[in-house]
UniProtKB/Swiss-Prot annotation:
Keyword Transmembrane: yes
Protein name: Beta-mannosyltransferase 2
Lineage: Eukaryota, Fungi, Dikarya, Ascomycota, Saccharomycotina
Cytoplasmic membrane side: 1-37
GO molecular function: mannosyltransferase activity
Source organism of the structure: Candida albicans (strain SC5314 / ATCC MYA-2876) (Yeast)
Induction pattern: Regulated on yeast-hypha and white-opaque switches, and repressed in biofilm.
Length: 654
């Protein structure tokens, strides 16, 4: 409009100047000037109407922020949308807009951005400090009778400081309230005072965010992160009423994209938009009339990628959730039934880009509204012979890369069900069958003190992602048919010398030789990674309550070249501190130290030493010593601070 108006004014100016000549009469000039004035007046009125329409009507109908302070035009459209097509999308760039508007029938504002991904993974530009860990090996001959120090080897790598990614809960929950989605209407009776808490600025007293876990979506050039946002009516972090699953998208430099659509496959040969950030409509059981000890919703979601039968990677989450099952139903003579339920906390798996109608997988008695609502597709994971335990938690997922190569896709996801007396489950991604035992060291049951944290990354797959002479050497040395996985578990210690509980990360390495011979080859004791600790209660000490660092997920792991042309690896680990943060740590050189720089790496040796729990016992024993030392040093330093404060208060020093 402005361009057209400028063009018309220029044309009028040109004709006017050419007409106003010394020989022209005054009347002729007057007529031209009058005509110009009326035309300009009409054009100005038209422009004013256009501006008024765009400024008020579009703002009101598209949820845009009205700029009442005269800021620049782009601030008026600060909520513009970004639409990202995968880099392998079959339609040319020039036809993306038409596909979005006509095929997907989605609206676009002129300020929105639409493009095919061109971004690749970026090595984190952060500062590092050196760290050293010990790994206890289970691959040594006579390891069961060996001393722990004889099984230990040291490895060095670099770690960044934690980068916090907690969201603005006022903003996020305010939008959830204002959007008033079907899912919000269903779940909000569990937190009826949300609006009041927003108005009174009391969100931080009752709402918490933790368990951030993410994956790098290579085809989209973004990080997809899930986290747990939970509500506690009492404000006690160990007594949540309900946990919600929040999903965000970050670009390749870890900056959040606040209004983004990913054009993802729908599983039926077509595509659909997925909008982020958002709360996922999860199919969970809940009852606002019974809240005591129930802990409704999705707890501890961990995200990972699987390759489906259509050949693309899609995100799934593994989580635990409270639900109930009918145990008995009896009818009396009047036709009325008495139904008895049993409550469980079970492990579920959900496909973030797939849907289901209704939620009879968690609620066997559905209401009419529930039957027609759309939820994220989910599946309960049940042990063999339909054996459902009262409580299941902390399964550590991993993928069988050899199976993927043979089939072209992932038909199963595997879980380290138990670290001590190793047990591994194999659960189908394709049907509703129960899980089966992939491996059991013995028939002993019990979680033990070493428990699941992150997923385990398949190192064989990682080694295929980068071409380098050192990588070729390692692949040539690796025993045939050996698979290696590395993950981060956590040892759970109670009253070990600092607070009620202490959790820290423990690095673990799992290997498989042949079809089903698994061994937990290496386990580390507690690793602090130089992470600053947060108190459980803001106004208390570090050894009051719980002292926690929980590993949640391996966000990405990439290989590259270092400055000296040697191979280098970059791992991003997500953690939570004090059950109230979403943090990222960048780790450089962990795989390099364990696999490439160790000339005596037993991971590259073929041996048939039997499995035992000795390395786990050593790791837990060393972790316990870490806790006692940490508690003693904290108390000593705390006493010194108190003495110093008291001495200063008396005007003397001690």
């Amino acid at each position: 409009m402005l361009a057209w108006l400028r063009h018309r004014i220029r044309s009028y100016n040109t004709s006017t100047y050419s007409s106003i000549l010394p020989s022209a009469s005054f009347g002729k000039v007057y007529k031209i000037g009058t005509k110009l004035n009326f035309t300009l007046l009409a054009l100005c009125l038209l422009l004013a109407c256009s501006v008024f329409f765009n400024y008020f009507y579009l703002a009101d109908n598209n949820g845009l922020d009205i700029d009442t302070k005269g800021e620049e035009e782009e601030n008026v459209f600060k909520d513009r949308k970004m639409v990202i097509f995968p880099n392998n999308f079959e339609i040319t760039d020039k036809n993306l807009l038409e596909y979005y508007l006509k095929t997907l029938e989605e609206p676009l504002h002129p300020q929105d951005t639409i493009y095919r991904n061109r971004f690749i993974y970026k090595v984190p530009d952060v500062s590092y400090t050196s760290q050293t860990i010990n790994l206890f090996s289970g691959l040594s001959q006579n390891s069961q009778s060996s001393k722990c120090e004889d099984l230990s080897s040291s490895y060095s790598f670099d770690v960044s400081g934690p980068q916090n990614k907690n969201c603005d809960l006022y903003k996020v929950l305010g939008k959830f309230l204002n959007d008033d989605s079907e899912y919000f209407q269903e779940i909000s009776p569990l937190f009826p005072k949300l609006k009041e808490m927003l108005v009174k600025k009391e969100i931080e007293k009752h709402w918490f965010q933790l368990i951030g876990s993410s994956v790098w979506l290579e085809q989209y050039g973004v990080h997809l992160m899930t986290s747990r946002i939970f509500y506690s009516s009492t404000g006690d972090k160990v007594k949540p009423v309900v946990s919600l699953t929040y999903v965000q998208v970050f670009d390749h430099e870890w900056r959040e994209i606040e209004n983004v659509e990913l054009i993802v496959p729908d599983g039926e040969g077509k595509y659909k938009p997925m909008t982020y950030p958002t709360f996922l409509p999860m199919s969970v059981y809940h009852n606002e009339k019974q809240q005591q000890g129930r802990f409704y919703g999705v707890e501890d979601p961990r995200i990972t990628l699987v390759r489906n039968k259509l050949g693309y990677d899609e995100p799934i989450i593994v989580y635990n959730s409270h639900h109930r099952k009918i145990t008995d139903a009896k009818s009396d003579n009047d036709g009325e039934s008495n139904i008895h339920f049993k409550a469980y906390r079970s492990i579920f798996m959900a496909w973030l880009w797939q849907n289901q109608k209704g939620k009879n997988n968690v609620e066997e008695i559905e209401t009419g509204k529930m039957k027609n609502r759309v939820y994220v597709k989910s599946k309960e994971l049940i042990k063999p012979n339909n054996k459902r335990e009262d409580k299941e938690k902390n399964w550590a997922p991993f993928i069988n890369y050899q199976q993927r190569l043979q089939q072209g896709f992932d038909s199963h996801v595997y879980f380290m069900y138990q670290f001590q007396d190793l047990k591994i489950l194999k659960c189908s991604l394709l049907d509703e069958e129960d899980c089966v035992w992939e491996y059991q060291f013995n028939d002993k049951n019990g979680a033990g003190r070493l428990r699941g944290g992150t997923e385990l990354v398949n190192i064989n797959q990682l080694l295929t992602t980068f071409d380098h002479p050192e990588i070729k050497r390692v692949k040539d040395l690796m025993p045939q048919n050996r698979e290696i996985w590395i993950g981060v578990a956590r040892a759970a210690l109670e009253k070990c010398g600092c607070g009620d509980k202490m959790y820290r990360p423990n690095i673990v390495i799992l290997i498989k030789d042949g079809d089903d011979q698994y061994r937990l080859s290496h386990v580390s004791p507690f690793v602090g990674l130089g992470i600053p600790i947060l108190p459980w209660w803001p106004d208390k000490g570090l050894c009051d309550g719980k002292n926690l660092i929980i590993p949640n997920g391996i966000s990405s792991w990439h290989l590259n070249k270092d400055e000296d042309n040697s191979v280098q690896d970059y791992l991003t680990l997500s953690i939570s501190r004090a059950d109230s943060t979403v943090d990222l740590l960048h780790i450089k050189g962990l795989l390099k130290s364990i696999l490439f720089d160790d000339p005596n790496s037993k991971l590259l040796e073929l041996n048939d030493y039997g499995f035992n729990n000795k390395n786990i016992e050593c790791a837990v024993k060393s972790s316990d010593a870490f806790c006692k030392k940490y508690g003693s040093e904290y108390k000593l330093n705390n006493n010194k601070e108190e003495d110093k404060a008291n001495g200063n208060g008396k005007g003397s020093s001690s």
